[in-house]
Amino acid sequence: MQPYEAIEEWKPRTRLGWLVKEGKIGSLKEIFDMNMRIKEPEIVDALLGRELQHEIIDINMVQKMTDAGRITRFRVVVVVGNQNGFVGLGVGKARQLRIAVDKALADAKLNIIPVRRGCGSFECGCSEPHSIPYQVRGKAGSVDVVLKPAPKGTGLVAGDTAKVILRYAGISDIWSWSRGKTSTTINFAQAVFDALRRAYRFVSVSEWGR
């Protein structure tokens, strides 16, 4: 059963969840306008439905020492988005891969954010939301990432992990620069996501659509 097919059986646990299920809130934008926190992944399923897509960008094995000995678990990193202004990144850990994927997917939905898009390149100026409106920096662990507006047709000049996240966010043109241990996929992904989150926070919600 797909997430959007299970919404009828969903029993919300939060006030926001009930507002969404009863149709009193009809979009993610309304939620962010009211500065409300998403605490149930089903909220995202209900509002984005079949628009929501996801992709696994990293699977790794991690070990933890306990009194019972060494425990090996899967660590999965997943990106979700509608490729039109909303993206989320999540991490899940479990001894079974399927459970780790499900946890990462739920975490990504809880972390979903609106993406500030625009045309900030002086070489373009088309006013279409194909890039970002200004340069922004993100950081995670030892990794620093800088995203810069690029003219239409440039494409995503970034590492493979960044390309996936940017594509799911609905960005098609960008210049990027990074330093640190970018081979560590989870840190690189979180740094890119941090940059997009900072880009959104840089302006007020009332400025959306300008």
Model regions: which residues?
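Ribosome-associated RNA-binding proteins
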Residues: 1-210
